[in-house]
């Protein structure tokens, strides 16, 4: 996922950003159950705050659980405030609702996922 941020011009050092994400993950898993994970990090290696989504063909091990739908939040380390934690909290609450999870999992396109996230997260 970090390589895609490089390709999009949102990150210059994807391996360093990835290391920041895994360091955060080592503190406490961001797996939420329901096959969802929300890795997140404030990093000096991200140029522009970004929400990235991966819908995997098969689940992967994520902490003590599995994840098949990954929503990665990356925010520039110098960004003001706690925006990423507000988005993380709002997203985690949404994921607790089966209707929201089903809408994400069954979305027909990347645009449909983006629209749903923008609406629910008030972006």
Q: Model-derived features: where do they sit?
A:
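Cytosolic covalent-transfer regions centered on His/Cys nucleophiles
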Residues: 1-123
């Amino acid at each position: 996922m970090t390589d895609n941020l490089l390709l999009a011009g949102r990150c210059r050092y994807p391996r360093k950003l990835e290391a920041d994400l895994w360091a955060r993950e080592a503190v406490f898993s961001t797996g939420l159950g329901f096959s969802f994970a929300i890795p997140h990090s404030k990093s000096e290696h991200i140029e522009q705050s970004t929400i990235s989504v991966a819908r995997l063909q098969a689940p992967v091990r994520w902490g003590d659980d599995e994840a098949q739908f990954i929503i990665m939040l990356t925010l520039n380390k110098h960004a003001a405030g706690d925006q990423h934690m507000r988005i993380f909290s709002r997203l985690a609450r949404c994921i607790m609702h089966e209707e929201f999870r089903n809408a994400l999992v069954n979305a027909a396109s990347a645009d449909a996922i983006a629209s749903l996230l923008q609406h629910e997260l008030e972006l």
